[in-house]
């Protein structure tokens, strides 16, 4: 991620195709050591591609991925089918928590 962030920073700064040396210089300016293997792979993958087009393409791919909102409803349905015994246990645990929290009321740390 740090290599990609430095690459994007350079493109925002006006350098259309940053080199590995450019990215390495940005990282070293803030005290981060660059990994040459990862940096070379990043440069080769992004060579000849427009960063703005890649971002737009990635955004459209992410938009098509389900966010998982429907998965919670299915899990809740399975928990409700477990029966009344499962519902009684959490209520007892909540009551115990209330009792424990009342023990500390009115006591100061440095009294």
From Swiss-Prot:
Composition-biased stretches (Low complexity): 76-88
Query: Where are the Phosphoserine residues found in this chain?
Result: 101
Cellular component, GO, one term: cytosolic large ribosomal subunit
**Keyword Ribonucleoprotein carried by entry:** yes
InterPro entries assigned: P1/P2_N_sf (IPR038716), Ribosomal_P1/P2 (IPR027534), Ribosomal_P1/P2_euk (IPR001859), Ribosomal_P2 (IPR044076)
What the entry lists under PANTHER family is as follows: 60S ACIDIC RIBOSOMAL PROTEIN FAMILY MEMBER, LARGE RIBOSOMAL SUBUNIT PROTEIN P2
Q: How does it assemble?
A: P1 and P2 exist as dimers at the large ribosomal subunit.
Q: What protein does this entry describe? A: Large ribosomal subunit protein P2
């Amino acid at each position: 991620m740090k290599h990609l962030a430095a690459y994007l920073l350079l493109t925002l700064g006006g350098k259309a195709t940053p080199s590995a040396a450019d990215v390495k210089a940005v990282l070293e300016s803030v005290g981060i050591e660059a990994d040459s293997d990862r940096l070379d792979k990043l440069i080769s993958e992004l060579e000849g591609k427009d960063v703005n087009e890649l971002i737009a393409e990635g955004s459209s791919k992410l938009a098509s991925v389900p966010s998982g909102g429907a998965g919670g409803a299915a899990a809740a349905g399975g928990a409700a089918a477990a029966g009344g015994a499962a519902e009684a246990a959490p209520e007892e645990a909540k009551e115990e928590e209330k009792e424990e929290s009342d023990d500390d009321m009115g006591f100061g740390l440095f009294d």
